[in-house]
């Protein structure tokens, strides 16, 4: 859904630029960023059964629950799964050693200026949403966030793949939940964010 809307918006933007150029050929310019990668192994990936891109919906957390918890407590963690299967090399050779599979969190909407325990916190993308509360990834649901994931950090904890859950592949289970370093300053509203990942075979 988001990709379709973005494509429609881009088409509109380019159409508007073409119309302007008909009247004035010197109207400025800009930069378009493209991202890609060449790999020697490809796999089928499904997050919560939705494909490689997905939405994960958390249960709401109340202000009472937030303010009753200590700072940086993991609140209402929600589990989600990443299934990886049918890996093949560039020449079509099946790559079926699931012990080589892994998930690496590469980035996201990280909280700007984060220090200490806030490292890895994913900032709210909704400017008019809840304030002073973030989302956090982890490999478990422990309230102490002992296995917090910092996207982009090479030392991030890794979820173990469950080969019994996916044919010719493995299932990786992760959690996402709320956290805040300042519980008393949190306000009500929507909390949305995102993180990016890549599948590794090594």
From Swiss-Prot:
Range of residues in the leader sequence: 1-22
Key words of the record: Disulfide bond, Fimbrium, Signal
Disulfide bridge partners, by residue number: 43-87
Protein's UniProt keywords contain RNA-binding: no
GO BP: cell adhesion involved in single-species biofilm formation
Annotated Gene Ontology cellular component terms: pilus
Highest taxon of source: Bacteria
Identification of the protein by name: Fimbrial subunit type 3
Gene of this entry: mrkA
